[in-house]
Every structure is written in C-alpha cells, then in structure tokens.
Amino acid sequence: MPAFFVAGEAAAVDCRAYPTPGVDWSNCKKRLLMLDNSNFEGANLSGVDFSMTDLSRTNLKKSNFSKAMLVRASLAGSDATSASFERAEGYRSNLSGISASGASFVSAEMQRSNFSDADLTNVDFTKAELGRAIFYKAKLANTRFALVNLSRATFHNVDMNGPVDFTNAFLFLTRIEGVDLSKATGLEQDQIALACGDDRTQLPEGLKTPPSWPCEDE
C-alpha cells in the first residue's frame, strides 16, 4: 500500500513509497533510476544510494541527503535550497545549474563533481573534498570553502559578488585564471603560490601576484 506524507506527521521509512514531499527513504537503495522532475521537498534521503540516478530538475528544497551516495548521479537544474548534503559521497556527480542557496556540503566528498552555472550563495563546504571539481560560471557569495581540498578545481568565470571564505583551503593547482578574488577572505600568500592564476587574477588587498604561476607553461 503506498505511503502518503501528511503535513505535521513524521513519515515512516518506506523504500517502496513514491517520490513525494517529506517521504522517508533513509538508507534505501535507489540506484540507476529515472527520478527527474520529482518533488522531494523536505524528504529524508539520508544514507540513500542514488548512484547513477537521475534527479535532474527536481524539487530538493530542505531535503536531507546526509551520508547519501550520489556517485555519478545527476542533480542538474534541481532546486536544493537549504538542503543538507553533509558527508554525502558524490564522486563525478552532475550538479550543473543547481540552485543550492543555503545548502550544506560540510565534509561531503564531491571530487570531480560539476557545479557549473550553480547558485552556491550561502553554501557551506567546510572540510569537503572537492578535488578537480568544476565551478565554471558558478555564483558564489557568502560561500565557505574553509579547510576544503580544492586541488585542481576550476573556478573560471565564477560570479564572486560577495565574500568567499578560503581559510586553510588547499589550492594546489586550483585554476583561478581571470578570477576576481578581491572579495575573498582567509587567503594567505602560500595558498596563492600553489594555485594557477594569470595577470587577470585579482587578489585581496595585502596579497601579491607571484613572480610566476605553476600552470603558465600549459
């Protein structure tokens, strides 16, 4: 018998339930499914295995993806406003065009994920693994990358229209060519020395352009 979500009542875990607002699929296996254009607003999706599942153009507002498996999943074009992805595993996931304002990716493992054209304002990535992630044309403001591994990540053409915290972030060969970092906070000179910028890269006050950049010969 299908389970229905009733406002004000706690939904019981039901792995056979249809995608509905507030559904509880915690720790269910939902691999290789086509769930695009669904409505999971407020759903409990913690620990769910969504590997290679299509969640594109889906309402994920205020949903809980903590410790979920999102390997090679697609959330492209979805609305994940105020959602939690804490400790999620999303290697090579597609989050291009996602609206994730106010979301939390604290301690998430999102290596090689695609955040192109994403709205990442007020997003907390503290202690996340984002090596080789792509942030092409992403919108960043009040975004936190503190203690994040951003090695070889790409920030080309980002819209950084507010402060972005890079405190103790690892920026080994991070691509910041042409990026305006003048509003960034927490950056130190030794972090900049590891990154790949160019003569168009704008640094915060007090930091100097290195004599050379590691990726100049590429």
Protein language model regions, located:
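Bacterial N-terminal signal peptides
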Residues: 1-4
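Tandem repeat scaffolds
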Residues: 11-218
